[in-house]
Design a protein with these regions (language model features):
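A short, N-terminal amphipathic alpha-helix
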Residues: 25-44
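Conserved donor-nucleotide/metal-binding helix-loop-beta segment in metal-dependent transferases, i.e.
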Residues: 112-140
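Short aromatic-hydrophobic micro-motifs that form the base-stacking/packing surface
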Residues: 103-107
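Active-site oxyanion/phosphate-handling segment shared across diverse enzymes
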Residues: 152-173
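N-terminal nucleotide-binding beta1-loop-alpha1 segment
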Residues: 1-14
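Active-site rim beta-loop-alpha module in soluble metabolic enzymes
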Residues: 135-136, 141-142, 146-148, 155
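Short beta-strand/loop segment that forms part of the nucleotide-sugar
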Residues: 47-56
Length: 173
């Protein structure tokens, strides 16, 4: 899930300290890195990759994702981050070829140290665990993953009443 990298609308908290141009440049670099890792995962047939975008319309999203080599894409829609993630789980399951055998992994798009081994390790851990969180230093998490077992049994997902963009996210989840 990501915001379209538009001047003044991405990395808004960071832009207060480094300026909007630098924030945009950093957003584009981190997106490029995330897509590079994601495309490697897809090309190795380790996992399907989907992107959920906000900040642009459907036609622009189609063009952008085509240029990135990403075939599965969605608009995020309205609501808080939790509502958007829950919506993406249902969309992904509905549109997946193997929807009943599918784990769902959300990763941040602002992870300069992300590697394909992070994803491979998460997939491996999902064989035994139903929910995995990759905690971050700011009280949130950089990854949240659900096993297909968990998703198939739970219509409730832990995204309700969370103070998003705060140091309470991990605790609230």
């Amino acid at each position: 899930m990501t915001k379209w990298p538009r001047f003044g609308s991405c990395k808004t908290r960071l832009s207060k300290d480094i300026g909007k141009n630098n924030a945009l440049r950093i957003q584009k670099q981190m997106l490029s890195h995330t897509f590079s890792v994601s495309n490697y995962i897809r090309d190795q047939e380790i996992a399907e990759i989907s992107i959920a975008v906000t900040g642009i319309g459907l036609n622009s999203t189609k063009r952008w994702c085509k240029n990135l080599g990403i075939n599965n894409f969605y608009l995020q829609g309205k609501g808080c981050l939790g509502e958007k993630m829950k919506r993406q789980i249902f969309k992904s399951r509905r549109n997946s070829i193997n929807c009943h055998k599918k784990n769902i992994i959300f990763i941040g798009t602002d992870l300069p140290n992300l590697s394909h081994t992070d994803i491979v390790n998460t997939i491996s851990k999902l064989e035994k665990k139903d929910v995995i969180l990759g905690p971050s230093n700011d009280g949130g998490y950089w990854l949240i993953a659900f096993s297909q077992r968990f998703i198939s049994k739970n219509n409730y997902l832990p995204f309700i009443n969370i103070k998003w963009s705060s140091n309470e996210v991990l605790k609230g989840t």
